[in-house]
Amino acid sequence: MRKGTRIALRVLGGLVGLILLVVLGSYVVSEMRMRKHYDDVRGTVVAIPGDSASIVRGKVIATLYGCTGCHTPTLAGMTMIDQFPFARLPSSNITSGQGGIAATYTDADWDRAVRHGVRRDGTPLFLMPSHEFNRMSDDEFGRLLAYVKSVPPVDKAPGSRTIYPLARVLHTFGAPLVPAEKIDHSTQANPQPPRGASLAYGEYLAGACKFCHGADLGGQKVGGEAGAPPSPPIGRASAVARWTEAQFFQTMRTGVTPEGRKLDPKYMPWPEIGQLGDDELRGLHLYLKQGVSQSASADR
């Protein structure tokens, strides 16, 4: 065997060994982190209203915050990701039907799961965006739970969950795949700003937009479904921010943009956003125009 060939084989063997070491180490580290217990997170019991107006409002919140996107409109769950070598991840059935969690969850359990990303057994949920719910006001969270509890039961068992090597490596090296790790669990929920046409209330509402449009509202690829279109930028440097108030209202209530493009309600929940009051939409529009800035290059 030639010397060059021997060196190449040694280098190749070293690389294979290094990869195996990284994968094995990532498995051990990620398993420890995913099995960590957050027993100090007790969960807060909030008042859950029973009136029809609160339930309707809760449905709007569930749509704005992506509950119906990840768990489906029936809240029975679906396979969110099925991509090797990343993961196979089903979302939970959150109704009270067979295979669902609602029948066994206490109000404190709901708070731990939704606003803290922690299961009933104290271990963290994987890819549950609780960091976006964590500061939701108790009043709004109560309305959300009122809606979830009102949804008819669906009998559906969740599929199996498998975390493949790539997800474990990404998790080990900092990818925020377990949001419970990045939440300050001692932080109290935000008091909800007065509902109305203010920058503060617009910022509060825009928290829901960040699920799909990104933390800076600069747009991003949305996971969960093959073929789902990327979300466009909607912050201060975007075309959306240049719409007039009347154009913004028209788009949110008809699903047709000033440019004549029809929004697909499967990906952009304009029917639910359109149920917001005029002052709420004014506040949201004000925030999108003034409150968030992403690079001008995001205007695409």
What residues fall within each predicted segment?
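Extended surface/linker regions that mediate inter-domain or inter-protein docking
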Residues: 13, 17-27, 136, 140-199, ...
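C-terminal capping alpha-helices of c-type cytochrome domains
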Residues: 27, 31, 106-116, 132-158, ...
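Electrostatic cytochrome c docking/interface patches
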Residues: 37-63, 172-206
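Gly/Gly-Pro-rich "capping" loops immediately C-terminal to redox-active cysteine motifs
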Residues: 44, 48, 74-107, 124-137, ...
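Interaction-mediating elements
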Residues: 55, 127-129, 146, 156, ...
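Periplasmic/extracellular electron-transfer cofactor-ligation site
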Residues: 63-88, 116-124, 151-155, 203-229, ...
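Short, solvent-exposed interaction modules
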Residues: 112-121, 176-192, 251-252, 256-258
